[in-house]
Structure formats: C-alpha cells, structure tokens
Amino acid sequence: MFYPVVQILIGIILVIILILGFYHLKRKPPKKKCKTDTDCKDKGHHCVRGACTDKSCLEAVKQDIKDIKLDPTIRSCDYAPGFYRFNATTADLQSPFGKTRIDLGKVWTTWSKEDEYCQSLCLQHKGSIGWEFDEMSLRGEGNCYCYTNSHPALKNSNNTTVMGIARNVL
C-alpha cells in the first residue's frame, strides 16, 4: 500500500537532485581574488577591486574610482603598479580635485624616469591619491604635482604631461 508512494517520493528526490546538479554546472566559477596584477598574470588580466579582470584600463578606472570625471576626449590609459597612468592628461584645476594641487616644484633625475620620480615623491606625501609630471625639457626636467582629493576630474592636456591616479586594489 505504501510502495507506490515511496517510489513517487524517490522519483521526486531524484528530479530535485538532477535539477540542482544542472543549476550548479551552469553557475560561473567565482572570480579569482587578487591584491596585485601579478596575482592575475596567468590570464593576462589585471587586478581591479580585488578581482582579476580583462577590462580595458578606462573601463577599470570607471569601475574602480567612484565619481571620477573624465574628459570625453581621453580615450586610453595604462595599468601601472598601484596607479592608472594617463598620457597627455592633466587635472581640471577648476574642480575640487584640481584645487588640491600641491606643487612640488621642478624635478630632475639622471635615470630618465622623471615621472616615476615624481610618483615616488607624491607617495611620500600624506593623503596623496594622484600625481602629475609636466616635462619642461628633453633633458628630463619638469614640474611635479600631487593631488589629495579623492574625486578625480581629468582633462586632456599637452603631449608632455603624464598623470597617475591611485588604484583601489584591495
């Protein structure tokens, strides 16, 4: 008398297990957690907000830095360790971000990495989230600026300006 009921219950349980099995197979595996780009090197991806991604640098900037304002003429950037690097870009000096500009004066190095030297100077400045290097001559001399406002506003500039905005890697 209970035999058909038991068969139906076993059938229902098997159908539920089958449905759950298919659901589990269709789910995407969780994104790999990361702290730096080197954690994502196996696929050529970059680390953005703690997850490996293959997004373009500009897409990553918009996801990573909330409330960033980018001039529509800015079409690209590069991933750099700890920073997003923009060529021919400067801060909008009329914005709250631009008004936090700290002029570190002229810098010059003999190792032809003036922008990296400017970056290292700004990293030593408390609260700095961005840096800008404006090359004045081909001899490696230029002006170095740091920024402390956490809502960047960037616009196009001359070809000798390099800007870096800190990445929010977890």
UniProtKB/Swiss-Prot annotation:
Residues 23-170 are virion surface. It is a single-pass membrane protein. The chain crosses the membrane at residues 2-22. It is found in: Virion membrane; Host cell membrane. GO terms for cellular component: host cell plasma membrane; membrane; virion membrane. Keywords: Early protein, Host cell membrane, Host membrane, Membrane, Transmembrane, Transmembrane helix, Virion. Residues 1 are intravirion. It comes from the Viruses. Induction: Early structural protein. Its main location: virion. Belongs to the asfivirus envelope protein p22 family. This is Envelope protein 168.
